[in-house]
Amino acid sequence: MRFAPSPGYVFLKEYPDEIIFQKIKTLKEEYIRRFECEPVSHRAARWGMNRTYFEQLDKNGILYDCSVTPLIDWTSARGYTENSCGPDYTDHPRKVYRVKGTGIIEIPMSVYMDHRFILNEGGNTSKKRNIKNFVRAVKGKKTLWLRPAGDNLIDLLYIVDQARKHHVDYLMFILHSSEMMPGGNPVFNTPERIEMLYENLEILFREISRDFEGISVADYGSMVGQKNLYVCSK
């Protein structure tokens, strides 16, 4: 490996193939030992996937992955070795697909473009802001995730509404366990913020439950795996 002058955090994909394989194998064996069941789904740290990583997951019997974030470019996230960075998923499929050359089914994160036009009233400043908002809405410059951020309940409900309108058959929700306790993360860092999170989740899940039901990545992957899915070589 050739190290960068001021390295960032390492991506697993930066290591040689054999080390990637052995790490996945070791973690899988430890998981089985502790929980007495075999893991079949995976998500990469920092969303850092590439072809080699997929191949090593496949060799270790992983069937489903959910690391792809459509519309998102992670190349600004530096790796540890020279010229290493995160992947660019801007043109990846937003629907479930098979990863070419492997037995893995990719279930991408729920990411949407925000085309809403929010009108501001009053004064020249608001007029300029309205023009800017309109351009952003038309071009779809803002991406929305189904991921709580403390002040984005309206965005989360918008995603659910868009999924319903476009007859999307799944929503991929993400929340780290560290985000469910005060002080475990910079966003929900107080008891009050945690309480607000749970209140928002109750509203969100109530809305989601109108058309969706909870299911694991493995169960959903097994269900859609019976279909004739698109094969992607990215």
Predicted regions and their residues:
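Alpha-helical structural signal in soluble globular domains
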Residues: 30, 34, 56-60, 203-207, ...
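Active-site-adjacent pocket scaffolds in enzyme catalytic domains
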Residues: 44-164
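A general structural motif
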Residues: 39, 61, 168-170
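Flexible glycine/acidic-rich beta-alpha junction loops that bind and position SAM and/or redox cofactors
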Residues: 1-3, 74-78, 179-184
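The substrate-binding groove and active-site-proximal loops of carbohydrate-active enzymes
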Residues: 8-20, 38-44, 83, 142-151, ...
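Short loop/turn segments at strand-loop or loop-helix junctions that form parts
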Residues: 1, 107-112, 173-180
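Metal-dependent polysaccharide deacetylase catalytic core of the NodB/CE4 family, i.e.
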Residues: 1-44, 48, 113
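C-terminal domain-boundary segment and adjacent tail
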Residues: 133-234
